[in-house]
Amino acid sequence: MNNTLAAANALKAGKLVAFPTETVYGLGADAQNESAVARIYETKGRPADHPLIVHIASKAQITDWASKVPDYASALATAYWPGPMTLILERSDLAKDFVTGNQASVGLRVPNHPVALELLNEFVKLGGKGIAAVSYTHLTLPTNREV
């Protein structure tokens, strides 16, 4: 079994996975698994009202997570995904409070890193819809740009 398939299986089993994106390493969980997502908040010491970004495999998944996709958002996704851009859109019923921090919106991103994309595609093959993630740095530590 390759590493990304093993990581996708771990996500489906409710475990946390570290994975690279083009900007940072992420700490991710199955975005539909409340207890797994809660472990991200616990591990990071992150307040529950701070939303997570849902990483998706392709633009086609936007409508799973967003109830409305304005034309400008679709155009931005076409132009800049995969890439380091997060779209903030009105959330659908799939985007639960435990991911969105009780916000009416959801942040969506298709990362431009071969490992992240392979992981997301393997996860989709297993029935996953998205990976809720944050940067792997601790909340109180400086970011790479601050160092």
Which residue ranges define each predicted feature?
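Active-site-adjacent structural elements in enzyme catalytic cores
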Residues: M1-L139, R145
